[in-house]
Amino acid sequence: MLRSLHVKNLALIRETEVEFGEGLNILTGETGAGKSLLIGSVNLALGGKFEKDMLRRGEESGLVELVFDCEEPRLAEKLKSMDLEPSEDGTVILSRKLSSGKSICRINGETVTAKQIKELSELLIDIHGQHEHQSLLHKKKHMEILDAYAGAEFAKCAEQVGALYHECAAL
């Protein structure tokens, strides 16, 4: 679950911190209030495309940081597969320092590639805008949602059933 967003020197934002609560969080406001800028900041932190003109005018660098609260076993496995250590308190911090023409991505303080952040972010967050509900039309997404809902114990059972099936098929 996304706990907080920290943005510094991006577009019109000098520096801001947004804390998110349990459950559903909704961004509302008048046109031009900055809702899209906040969502764009999240996308940047998740490895989205960065252009130099996204920096606040007159600034050399910017920063976007996301803090997630997550103790899901799949996440810990993914971190280990990337040679990264999960934090002791169950948080995952994704950060991206943006400067003229380049950026530095980090997961829990370790420098990583934008591709690695994108891979990890698939386990952390799902952002939907207007008319973006089409992901529910993909059968693969159905299984991902059901597997996430069922939990780790079910995944272990499904793995055992699969192994037994392959044993029987080999006979």
Short names for language-model regions:
Residues 4-7, 11-145, 149-166:
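Gly/Lys-enriched N-terminal cap/neck module of very large, oligomeric protein machines
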